[in-house]
């Protein structure tokens, strides 16, 4: 508890900067509209909240229905808080309308939450007959944003009060003095009735906030665990989470790829939008894992190459007749492509480029014979990355942009390796690039942010990062 209060105290100093932000981790900016929608959805009782609110089997169930928190045997039902009122006056709660949610972010503290609802009641009137009443109620609460013992963002109810509004009489006769009696009873019981509702709603939202931090699988490569790097920040428009991605191997060991020294420059967030920023580090880490696992290496054989791609000694000799003119003709070629170093990703000027340094060993062989080495090349392949977001990850599709080669060693005469660049580009584009795209199907994982769907987000490549923006 002491640690939690210490965090709350520090929070008063933590408010986000409105200028161009520089960061090296994953960044999530949650617009206040999204937080408001999460609270509203918890009241409606969406299927995702069934474990918290109970089974949702009909329109009138859920949080407000007969089987929910407030209806039936709940707070509004038989035996609930209003049982006391019923014993005193025969007053019974008949209906509670879906509250209207009003939300205000409090920089350096948390949230001011208001729920405006209408309570429908009936009772036996003092003059006989049935009285039907309705009272407007505003529930106002101050909610602190803190960090739980698990290291997740958490909303904590600090203060709650109710304000009784207009009371309407729909049927029956009620003397004016009894209006005051009803008002006094409601004033006493409503805080005990509706403030626990706020606490329950916050519990639902806290589960969604807690999902921001968790383990995301990278398939055979390992996983990424997201954790808070710093205290969350609060402005009057959004909550900002600075998230540290921790990469782990399949065995669970932490893989510490060097982070870029150049921070990402993220533009200011527009109103009524939420953002996730994917840092350069995650791109370099993904390609680094692929390289260390050998997923970027390939043996290119004639069986893998389309018929329109030349891959024989005859084709090669035509390109370099002075160096390779004496080779036996019509023999098939083998290309052993090995990426010896981690690729380098560049995110700059609305483009995503990947540089792959590779050694290409070219051999020829007679069917059923032993392959014979011709030469080795040191190459740098520059591929362009097309990025597409989905709900859970950022998909990457590669296409070759350019290729440069130098001769590392030759078992024939010396030659200028640049004369093979066009031919190799044809081979790599036809065979190697599709293989890379299969390996990259794992994508770049996105943290879960209040169940916000980023599949239709606007994607922007900025300096050393990719920013996904979705309208609230």
From Swiss-Prot:
Q: List the disulfide bonds.
A: 160-195
Q: In which tissues is it expressed?
A: Detected in nasal septal epithelium.
- Report the locations given in the UniProt record: Secreted; Cytoplasm
| Glycosites | 138, 284, 453
Q: Which UniProt keywords apply?
A: Cytoplasm, Disulfide bond, Glycoprotein, Secreted, Signal
Stated role: May have the capacity to recognize and bind specific classes of odorants. May act as a carrier molecule, transporting odorants across the mucus layer to access receptor sites. May serve as a primary defense mechanism by recognizing and removing potentially harmful odorants or pathogenic microorganisms from the mucosa or clearing excess odorant from mucus to enable new odorant stimuli to be received.
* This protein's name: BPI fold-containing family B member 3
What species is given as this protein's source?
Homo sapiens
